[in-house]
């Protein structure tokens, strides 16, 4: 395939490839596990993560988008490299735009969701919960008078469990008491999640974007070290707004301009 030489060619190229998407994989080596977006192959001493073009929402695969897998995988690769001073990660090699070879890890059954703004449209989003009258969420106290899409006084960690059918919000206290993680591991991971998010916000703002919220996953490698895994700061795992127009749109009671999969969530 020919390379895209400038951003003005993106739309044209995507249109030509609309029927040429990576929907599924089938390799003879390794034990295959199929996720909503990624296919994972467990090899002898590592795993191969193949990011497809599948588009998911509300735990369902809805469609496919040309080059989506490449965007997600290469975005993660960039951020993994830029954040390794905060926490090591599972990446061994990026042999293809859609593929990451990674360390085998024992994954913590908790997703570390960090939020900088009160927003969202799903049943577990901070705004939905707040608008329904709750003033405590995942162990965080919420003040009266917050408005949708408002910046929080400080970044907030709202963890969820990783369960087969549906994740559920959980407090740090319950994470430890229910045995999801040890207190020591939780303290370390929660600290790193907040550090990663602060760095992500700073970097995004330098590039004209607001990193609104995101999720991280972590696990222990074969040496017992805690590492960052899965993906980081992608349009699938994160919410991004355009910084330049944010204040004016809030003043005019308009939704912020977003560049993530929130549009598909709202549509559904």
Where are these regions (language model features)?
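Active-site loop/lid in soluble adenylation, ligation, and acyl-transfer enzymes
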Residues: 9, 14-160
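Coil-to-beta-strand transition motifs
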Residues: 107-109, 207-211, 222-226
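A long amphipathic alpha-helix within ATP-dependent nucleotide-binding catalytic cores
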Residues: 181-212
């Amino acid at each position: 395939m020919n390379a895209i030489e400038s951003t003005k060619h993106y739309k044209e190229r995507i249109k030509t490839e609309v029927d040429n998407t990576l929907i599924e994989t089938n390799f003879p080596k390794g034990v295959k596990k199929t996720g909503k977006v990624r296919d994972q192959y467990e090899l002898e001493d590592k795993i191969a993560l193949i990011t497809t073009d599948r588009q998911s929402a509300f735990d369902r695969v809805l469609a496919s988008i040309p080059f989506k897998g490449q965007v997600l995988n290469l975005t993660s690769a960039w951020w993994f490299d830029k954040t390794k001073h905060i926490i090591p990660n599972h990446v061994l090699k990026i042999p293809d735009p859609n593929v990451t070879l990674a360390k085998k890890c024992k994954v913590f059954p908790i997703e570390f969701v960090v939020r900088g703004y009160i927003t969202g449209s799903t049943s577990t989003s901070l705004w939905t919960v707040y608008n329904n009258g709750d003033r405590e969420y995942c162990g965080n106290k919420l003040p009266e008078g917050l408005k949708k899409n408002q910046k929080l006084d400080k970044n907030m960690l709202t963890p969820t469990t990783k369960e087969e059918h549906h994740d559920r919000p959980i407090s740090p206290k319950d994470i430890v008491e229910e045995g999801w993680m040890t207190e020591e591991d939780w303290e370390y991971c929660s600290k790193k999640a907040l550090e990663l998010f602060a760095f992500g916000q700073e970097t995004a703002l330098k590039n004209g974007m607001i990193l609104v919220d995101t999720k991280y996953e972590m696990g222990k490698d074969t040496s017992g070290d805690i590492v960052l895994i899965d993906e980081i700061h992608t349009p699938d795992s994160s919410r991004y707004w355009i910084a330049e127009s944010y204040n004016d749109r809030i003043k005019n009671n308009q939704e912020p301009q977003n560049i993530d999969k929130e549009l598909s969530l709202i549509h559904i």
